């Protein structure tokens, strides 16, 4: 009876904790509260910034902040137009360039954006520099507004809940058998659910990123040249998709090539939203006249 109660509790928790990513329509699990994820991510961000070396290159920092402000403004405008104004209070935007040769960037839940200098070096100073940087930052902000961090934490929590149910079901088994099945269970959740979801997150963030970049006035095609550069920098050494938390560069480029024409058609004619300033915690709100054909989306 106890086993059934535990199992039903897990199922009930999952069924009542689903939400939707508005830009893609994908259903997602949401067992962790907004306040919990924001608090935890802020702690992680502050811990990182205590040890990170903030770039002293004023010109490079200004480039990052300019692009990040426009992407942040596009994100807030999108949330406003699509009726997600309650989420706006969760964003206290900060934009940083740190001295790190790794090809990386991130945006914490709550809008803490960090770009590594190695990413800027890869992008270079060509004509597409700002457009490619917008693809990077748009992707990272995409993770934030799609609440991927919250979803990942929920998946981990569900894994723990599932493990509790498994332990109850196996109550009469030997310790050795319990350990063997528990190990198999862990492998199954890692490679059968958690990693594929992470790859879905990456592709979804790619899509949201080009939408935000387009709204902000950047050329979404630069996302393709960005990933071509990333692929070249890796020497073509993409990890096996089954064992990777990230899709291959080839997969990402393929998905972007399919999505970009649709994104340009749907969002390419919106007027550019007002930008943020580095010292303000939220962006200025764009007007929300909803007249764009097909989506009801217009910013101006």
List each model region and its residues:
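A Zn2+-metalloprotease active-site environment signal
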Residues: 2-6, 10, 18-300
